[in-house]
Amino acid sequence: MYIPCLMCTQHPDSTVKITAGEEVDEAVVAFLAYGCDEVMVDYEGKATPYSQPRDVASKALALGLPLGERFFITPRVPNPRLEDFERSMLSLEAAVLANSYSQRAAGVQAVKWVVLPMTEDVETMAFVYKALDMKARDLAELNAVKRDSSIELIPLVEDAMRQIKIESFIKALFRTAAQSGRILEHMRIFLGISDSAVRHGHMASALAMVKALGQISEINRDGEFKISPIVGMGSPPFRGGLNNPHLAVPEAAQYAGYKTATIQSAVRYDVSYAEYQKVREAILSVYTPRRLHVEEAWITKASELYREAIRPYIGKIAELANAIPSTRDRVSWREYGRVIEGVEWRVPRAIVYTATWYFAGVPPTLLDARFIAWAYKNDLLDDVLRALPATVEEWKFESRFYSRERAEKTLGGEIVKDIDNAFDILGIKPEPDRTYITLLNSADTQPHAIALGRIRGFLG
């Protein structure tokens, strides 16, 4: 079975506004110009037309692309536990109807997989499998889709504490698939880093990702199950950094073991095509999966210290988030934001959250300053940096956008002390981008946020 390597997504992480009406052409350009072999049609928290999977299939087939063989359309549907039930069911129907069209037009199955976001229990997955089967069966009775065609679910696991237990979760997922009548030998698992970083901080989410990829590699070596991991990462280090032209090589090595990686919006719209090609080459390089030990205690401590660090600023970040524009047809984060469990904080979704910290003068990767200091004090920093070898390069990159003046004015002096101490521990002398910092220190509107994002090469 052919497994795609590059998944083009509709993340609102670019400074360029893309409307839902432009996304069909965007998908075809991703196939033809960017070398992506999979396009995610996104319904999670997003007002995407239900005809879009079918429309992408129509345009791709008209251009002679081998849809269903080397090119795929993969919708991400709303989790019915978290969003409107009706939207979840309609997006599943859109996936099945896209296959009805592609089978009638070309005898191929355009949609082989559907992504289920925020997968934290097997019951929701079983429910969605049942809904998919019911919709496919109804269309088969109308001779609108082949009876032997089925769509597999890709669980999207987006929390560090779930990712570190991924081995047992995968076994439960295979049992759930079997109970739905699917005897699988292979499954694609989507590991997301962005929402995990919002909840737990960058270093906790990165350590959990490395640990999860290691566990999946062991599962594949054992041979009982075959897993193809997808890593969902963007351009900022806080969101994985894999799409960042300055960081793609060290990040690809750090997260070795993935089969598929996302190609998000910023790397296609906010950097040059030549820089995109560097990112693509780095992602497609084959790195040997890493065999190393990551202590759960590090992840727990990093999460604890991150939450402690951001606690005083949650209200201010929610206020500043009004300056961050939406560059896709998204549902407002105030309707569909993120709750950090255990503390009941409602915060913006990952891209707006990330962009807002930059707007406050503090690149969010630097919010792990206290964990850096803790690891150093406990003689664990070398071990942590072996697990996360891209860390120093990430902090050097982020230093270009760190403004002490802006941070002190917006958030106060305590956070600046922590960050400066961590830079000293890592042996990094910040080298701020003077043009960027000058603009940032007087920024207060959405046009400022857009201009700053263009300098960085991403919105958030």
Swiss-Prot record:
Its EC number is 4.1.1.31. Keywords: Carbon dioxide fixation, Lyase, Magnesium. It comes from the Archaea. Its cofactor is Mg(2+). Pfam families: PEPcase_2. One of its GO terms (molecular function) is magnesium ion binding. The keyword NAD does not apply. One of its GO terms (biological process) is tricarboxylic acid cycle. It catalyses: oxaloacetate + phosphate = phosphoenolpyruvate + hydrogencarbonate. Homotetramer. Belongs to the PEPCase type 2 family. NCBIfam families: PEPCase_arch. Catalyzes the irreversible beta-carboxylation of phosphoenolpyruvate (PEP) to form oxaloacetate (OAA), a four-carbon dicarboxylic acid source for the tricarboxylic acid cycle. This is Phosphoenolpyruvate carboxylase. It comes from Pyrobaculum aerophilum (strain ATCC 51768 / DSM 7523 / JCM 9630 / CIP 104966 / NBRC 100827 / IM2). The gene is ppcA.
